[in-house]
From Swiss-Prot:
Cofactors, names only: Mg(2+)
Catalytic activity: IMP + diphosphate = hypoxanthine + 5-phospho-alpha-D-ribose 1-diphosphate; GMP + diphosphate = guanine + 5-phospho-alpha-D-ribose 1-diphosphate
Protein name listed in UniProt: Hypoxanthine phosphoribosyltransferase
Protein family per UniProt: Belongs to the purine/pyrimidine phosphoribosyltransferase family.
Assembly information from the UniProt record: Homotetramer.
Species assigned in the record: Salmonella typhimurium (strain LT2 / SGSC1412 / ATCC 700720)
Presence of keyword Disulfide bond: no
Residues given in the record as diphosphate binding sites: R43, G44, R165
Residues that bind IMP: E99, D103, S104, G105, N106, T107, L108, K131
Spans through the membrane: none
């Protein structure tokens, strides 16, 4: 399928928003008194996670999960599979799930449910991109970088069939007439 990628959110805007999210997260957790863990959902969140953890100014651990509901195309499936679980115990800790993009909410709802059973002190969600118009499951999201329209986006860690993760901006995929 022939397509092009148009810049939707430039790199400078992303960096500025992540700095602001870091300040908000720091403010929320600075007096918690508990250990904090940022849980990045791979693969898409890795760039966001790396930049965000440098902006969060409270001591924190970093861990990762891989949960998948996407195939190699442009649509989501309803099946959610945990492909890689956390390496560390989160019991009694403040846990912040870091996601690249929330679409239907199915994946995040399942991850939140699984992590909630592990008895964290608190459980919150931070996403770079949110598509509220696509939501099928109500998931509380405490920290949102950008709310975006229902466009297929790539870049800044987000892929299309494993391509475009390297882009320093978020772009929308525009299909071309063949």
């Amino acid at each position: 399928m022939k397509h092009t990628v148009e810049v939707m959110i430039p790199e400078a805007e992303i960096k500025a928003r992540i700095a602001e999210l870091g300040r908000q997260i720091t403010e929320r957790y600075k007096d918690s008194g508990s250990e904090m863990v940022l849980v990045g959902l791979l693969r898409g969140s890795f760039m966001f996670m790396a930049d965000l953890c440098r902006e969060v100014q409270v001591p924190h651990e970093v861990d990762f999960m891989t949960a998948s509901s996407y195939g190699s195309g442009m649509s989501t499936t309803r099946d959610v599979k945990i492909l890689k679980d956390l390496d560390e115990d989160i019991r009694g800790k403040d846990v912040l799930i870091v996601e690249d993009i929330i679409d239907s909410g199915n994946t995040l709802s399942k991850v939140r449910e699984i992590l909630g059973l592990r008895e964290p002190k608190s459980l919150a969600i931070c996403t770079l991109l949110d598509k509220p118009s696509r939501r099928e499951v109500d998931v509380p999201v405490e920290f949102v970088g950008f709310s975006i329209p229902d466009e297929f986006v790539v870049g800044y860690g987000i892929d299309y069939a494993q391509r475009y993760r390297h882009l320093p901006y978020v772009g929308k995929v525009v299909l071309l007439d063949e």
